[in-house]
Amino acid sequence: MKKLWLSATLVAALSACTSMPPAASQAGGPIKKPEMDRIAAAPAAMAATAASGSFSQFLALSAQMQPELAPAVAAYERKATLQGDDLVNISRLLGLYNRLKNQAAVIDATARMVSIPTVRSDKVPPHEDKHIIAFGALVEGMAKEFGLQYRNVDNRVFEVKLPGSGPDEFGILTHSDVVPVVADEWVLDDGTKLDPFKLTRVGGNLYGRGSIDDKGSIATVLYAMKAVKESGLPLARTIRLMIETTEETGGDAMKYYRAKTTLPEYNIVLDSKYPAVVAEKGSGALRASFPLQA
């Protein structure tokens, strides 16, 4: 499930909300992917990102392998205000650290989410559905474990926040509901039948209803927020994760939510895989008729 690799990019994006008054030393330039790949492949990186490893240990290793990172790492360790390339590099290293340390945990969390069949029922409205309620309870447990703020908006939207120092918020929109399952579509080329609600690894892919759309995103964001919080990087804006429960069936839950609260001024949508999403403001249908000639 390639979306799990978004954790590095996402954490960097969240960290970029860090306040940036006048500041510390500047590095020689932003660290690039080849350098990050070299750090990730180092045997010592495994120890630095093990259960007992810390972000500071990982930064020390990174500065040892890439000496030009040393000023940014030193500024971070003395809690100086970061800006420019220093901020970019610490953010990117935090993303890499999060991916190496938490990837297995993200997959495990995604598996737990996939196991909850949050398909819309014809018998009860979504906000009364036991599976939607169970999903909210799972998110609440993770949020509390990670030291994040949680709010359940009447089982319509589950909200998780990482507070920043300023009044502004940055929103991340996701959804927990999934489309119905067609059993014939869950068969591999060799005839193996898959359980849609059991996350299954086949080669380098993970199969499960909602693994991409959109439960893998939710698990990834939660661990990204956890990593940012534990890093101690100061946020200028509050990060607000919003988990809608009716996205696949009209979005009534988001309408309810908007009547109850104010959306952040800036939001990103993590929904399946798109090259770019500027905004999703609604949907429509075009009907046309054409004369036919025999």
Q: Where are each of the predicted segments found?
A:
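Short loop segments at secondary-structure junctions
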Residues: P163-P167, K273, P291-A294
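Positively charged n-region of N-terminal signal peptides that target proteins for export
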Residues: M1-L4
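Acidic/histidine-rich catalytic neighborhood of metal-dependent amide-processing enzymes
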Residues: D214-F290
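Short, low-complexity, disordered segments immediately C-terminal to signal peptides
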Residues: P21-P34
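Repetitive helical segments and hydrophobic/amphipathic motifs
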Residues: V11-A12
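Acidic/His- and Gly-rich active-site-bordering loop/insert found
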Residues: A42-P43, A47, F55-F58, S62-L206, ...
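A short glycine/serine-rich beta->alpha loop
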Residues: G203-I212, P275
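C-terminal motif of bacterial Sec signal peptides marking the signal peptidase cleavage site
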Residues: S15-A16
